[in-house]
UniProtKB/Swiss-Prot annotation:
InterPro entries: GK/Ca_channel_bsu (IPR008145), Guanylate_kin-like_dom (IPR008144), Guanylate_kinase (IPR017665), Guanylate_kinase_CS (IPR020590), P-loop_NTPase (IPR027417). Residues 6-186 form the Guanylate kinase-like domain. Keywords: ATP-binding, Cytoplasm, Kinase, Nucleotide-binding, Transferase. The keyword Kinase applies. Its EC number is 2.7.4.8. It is an enzyme of class 2 (transferase). The gene is gmk. The lineage of its organism: Bacteria, Pseudomonadati, Pseudomonadota, Gammaproteobacteria, Enterobacterales. NCBIfam families: guanyl_kin (TIGR03263). This is Guanylate kinase. Belongs to the guanylate kinase family. Essential for recycling GMP and indirectly, cGMP. Its main location: cytoplasm. GO terms for molecular function: ATP binding; guanylate kinase activity. It catalyses: GMP + ATP = GDP + ADP.
């Protein structure tokens, strides 16, 4: 598998599990982990408060298709009739420069990256129950019953792939889930193979003193 100076992590979850809120909190309290969230491209319209280039790169279907034709995506998928994709070169540049990159993508994108034989780790965020998941989806009060039904169906399909991931975090208590998420990412940075790659001189010098 291809190894980079930085670590690549993938976080997935069904809509309503609290993934985006957890990732935002992760970035705000990031004095130790030093991670960077990849910004995806999407064909869906901007929601109130979203900023182009910060939340997503909002592009047309034609532009997205051109990027597919030019093999510019590391992964892409169609979700709720909209396309989402991760641009390839920007990720490789960040990883090569030692940046720890987090991808906020679904199981389809995760499997596409797995097929590319890259070195990465995966985390799946679960809701505490199906009832709580539906409650969270209804909380915004903007969607019809049919839309909620479709989102629940999609969410359960997403959940069916959770065992394909390295780690599972249940988002029942937000603060605890955030600690778990931070702990998983930090543990990857402290693994022996990563430490040997980045601190080989120090480790070898200390061992030579034995």
């Amino acid at each position: 598998m291809k190894k980079y100076s930085g670590l690549l992590g993938i976080i997935s979850a069904p809509s309503g599990a609290g993934k985006s809120t957890l990732i935002n909190a992760l970035q705000k309290n990031d004095s130790i982990l030093q991670i960077k969230l990849s910004i995806s491209y999407t064909t869906r319209k901007k929601r109130p408060g979203e900023v182009h280039g910060k939340d997503y790169y909002f592009i047309s279907i034609e532009e997205f298709q051109n990027m597919i034709n030019q093999n510019m995506f590391l992964e892409y998928a169609k979700v709720f009739n909209h396309y989402y994709g991760t641009e390839k070169n920007s990720i490789k540049l960040m990883l090569n420069s030692g940046v720890h990159v987090i991808l906020n993508i679904d199981w389809q994108g995760m499997n596409q990256i797995r097929n590319k034989k890259l070195d990465f780790y995966t985390i799946f965020i679960l809701p505490p129950s199906q009832k709580e998941l539906e409650k969270r989806l209804r909380f915004r009060g903007l969607d019809t019953d049919q839309v909620i039904f479709d989102r629940m169906k999609q969410a359960m399909n997403e959940i069916s792939h959770c065992k394909e991931y390295d780690y599972i975090i249940i988002n029942d208590d937000f603060n605890i889930a955030l600690i778990y998420l931070q702990s998983v990412i930090l543990s990857k940075q402290l693994k022996i193979d990563y430490q040997e790659y980045h601190n080989s001189n120090l480790i070898n010098n200390l061992l030579s003193c034995l």
